[in-house]
């Protein structure tokens, strides 16, 4: 798809002098022209040389390389972001392969754990339970009036690291950075939010540097009433905003999604975004093998909201390929810490009940135990696909992977848990245990694997392939809701850009250098589906593409003109 770069018009702004230099969205640093320095009272406040953004980015890249640890690199990049956002995004886009793991997973996990220690400057909105009666005032304090995308967390389930309290703010900040870097959504349109409802992390409560509300987490009615107050305040201030729920605990994630998805344009990336990118990956892998997803047998390790969300979207896709719902569900097997989910299991969660296997259908299985372990399931199902969303390291053992490979010559193994310390098995081990025959996709980034004189590229099943395009598509089309069909169209579009499908070799997912192209294509597919579903005003394909082009922000400086407040 051709990328059209819109001409940048001059920007009229009222700020000048040091105030302008302290405004990250407007600051150009040494790139202010001589005329701008005169007009905005900047003469003498900057070094003599006027630099281009590429010259600035080259200096920043040299400085970045001087940092030895990933967390120090993260802190450095966040400092640039809080000083000069345009430069930050130009730098990140120039080095996306290198910097995406630093600004988001896996490094963002450490940044969340150390949030209060490494805190430098305010970004986003912190809404504590103590301030619940000031919700409208808090949102009125947001300086950017035209907010189009909000990412909100309550910090309770940050990646695989658990309760990080307000340290969870690192996730919305990082996520929105990818909305801009990958999806071209202007940073001026984005807002990270953390709902500070306390923390049950005793280490944080005992930490003298912890900056959040020092109180155990509120629960039950108090919690849901507080979240509802936030949603209503958002609807009042920005009625057309896209709201993304991020890293809420399993007990709250699905109820909140179900409660609000038809009230405000919203989605949960952990459930729906992860499902969409996983399904897109599996569609591509199946096509590359000359088959369809509906022909595969799939085993999950992890039956939480994320795992069940992926499973439901796989079932929906296989139904689109011709299976009945019953046949589709019989091909998906969910294993959690209590074993295979069956209809005789007590205390199932509501979203798990449709994903059980009937115990009567398992009587012929080769197992002496009442609890059917992952190994039992792999041995009896003989799956083609194994997906890990358990958040527990090392659970894909050599015995399990070799048992899978015994019955499947080209297994697809996807250890998706984040961060890397929580991955079910490393790509290196999976490749070795399958004699180089496995197709591996992970949730966190891994280097290519060298095994027996051959290099195996490892695809990262990164939600960043999906959610930036969804956001751009929603903004461009004016969609009022995000439907399951819109998510499915994103998966289908992602699969079309697989190098393995297009060329018969290479990664199952596109290279990161192509992610803006993929995001624009997903935006078009999502916007078109929104129109077909009646949640966006119908336009021509040309008009939709023009809206995408016009909303696609470029990390380039604009000329400034002085105006009064």
From Swiss-Prot:
Positions of transmembrane segments: none
Major enzyme class: oxidoreductase
Pfam families: malic, Malic_M
Highest taxon above the source species: Bacteria
Site (Important for activity): 270
Keyword Hydrolase: no
HAMAP family: NAD_malic_enz
The family this protein is said to belong to: Belongs to the malic enzymes family.
Name listed for the protein in its UniProt record: NAD-dependent malic enzyme
Name of the coding gene: maeA
């Amino acid at each position: 798809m051709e990328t059209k770069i819109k001409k940048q018009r001059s920007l009229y702004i009222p700020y000048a002098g040091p105030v302008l230099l302290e405004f990250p969205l407007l600051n150009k640093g040494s790139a202010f022209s001589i005329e701008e320095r005169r007009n905005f009272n900047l003469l003498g406040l900057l070094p003599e040389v006027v630099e281009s953004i590429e010259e600035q980015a080259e200096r920043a890249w040299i400085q970045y390389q001087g940092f030895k640890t990933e967390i120090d690199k993260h802190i450095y990049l966040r400092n640039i972001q809080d000083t000069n956002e345009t430069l930050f995004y130009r730098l990140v886009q120039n080095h996306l392969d290198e910097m995406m793991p630093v600004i988001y997973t896996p490094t963002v996990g450490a940044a969340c754990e150390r949030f209060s220690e490494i805190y430098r400057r305010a970004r986003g909105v912190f809404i504590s339970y103590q301030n619940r009666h000031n919700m409208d005032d808090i949102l009125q304090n947001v300086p950017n009036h035209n907010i189009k995308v909000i990412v909100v967390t309550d910090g309770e389930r940050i990646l695989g690291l658990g309760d990080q309290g307000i340290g969870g703010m690192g996730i919305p900040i990082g996520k929105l950075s990818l909305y801009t870097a990958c999806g071209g959504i202007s940073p001026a349109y984005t807002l990270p939010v953390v709902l500070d409802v306390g923390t049950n992390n005793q280490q944080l409560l005992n930490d003298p540097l912890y900056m959040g509300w020092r109180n155990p987490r509120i629960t039950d009615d108090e919690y849901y009433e507080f979240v509802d107050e936030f949603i209503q305040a958002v609807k009042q201030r920005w009625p057309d905003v896209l709201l993304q729920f991020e890293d809420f605990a399993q007990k709250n994630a699905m109820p909140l999604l179900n409660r609000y998805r038809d009230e405000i344009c919203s989605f949960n990336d952990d459930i729906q975004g992860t499902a969409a990118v996983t399904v897109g990956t599996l569609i591509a892998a199946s096509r590359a093998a000359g088959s369809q997803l509906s022909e595969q047998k799939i085993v999950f390790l992890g039956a939480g909201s994320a795992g069940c969300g992926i499973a439901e979207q796989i079932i929906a896709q296989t139904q689109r390929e011709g299976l009945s719902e019953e046949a589709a569900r019989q091909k998906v097997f969910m294993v959690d810490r209590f074993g295979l989910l069956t209809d005789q299991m007590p205390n199932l969660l509501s979203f798990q009940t449709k994903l059980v296997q009937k115990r009567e259908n398992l009587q012929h299985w080769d197992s002496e135990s009442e609890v059917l372990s992952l190994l039992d399931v792999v041995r009896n199902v003989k799956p083609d696909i194994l997906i890990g969303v358990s958040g527990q390291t090392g659970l894909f053992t050599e015995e399990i992977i070799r048992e899978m490979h015994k019955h499947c010559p080209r297994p697809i193994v996807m250890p998706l848990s984040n961060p890397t310390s929580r991955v079910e098995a490393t790509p290196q081990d999976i490749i070795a245990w399958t004699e180089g025959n496995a197709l591996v996709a992970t949730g966190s980034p891994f280097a290519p694997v060298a095994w027996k004189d051959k290099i195996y590229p490892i695809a990262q099943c990164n939600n960043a392939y999906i959610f930036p395009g969804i956001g751009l598509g929603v903004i461009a089309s004016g969609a009022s809701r995000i439907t399951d069909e819109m998510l499915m169209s994103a998966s289908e579009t992602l699969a079309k850009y697989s190098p393995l499908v297009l060329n018969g070799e290479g990664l199952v997912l596109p290279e990161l250098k192509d992610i803006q192209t993929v995001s624009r294509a997903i935006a078009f597919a999502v916007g078109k589906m929104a129109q077909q579903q009646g949640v966006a005003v119908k336009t021509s394909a040309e008009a939709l593409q023009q809206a995408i082009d016009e909303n696609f922000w470029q990390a380039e400086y604009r000329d400034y003109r002085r105006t009064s407040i």
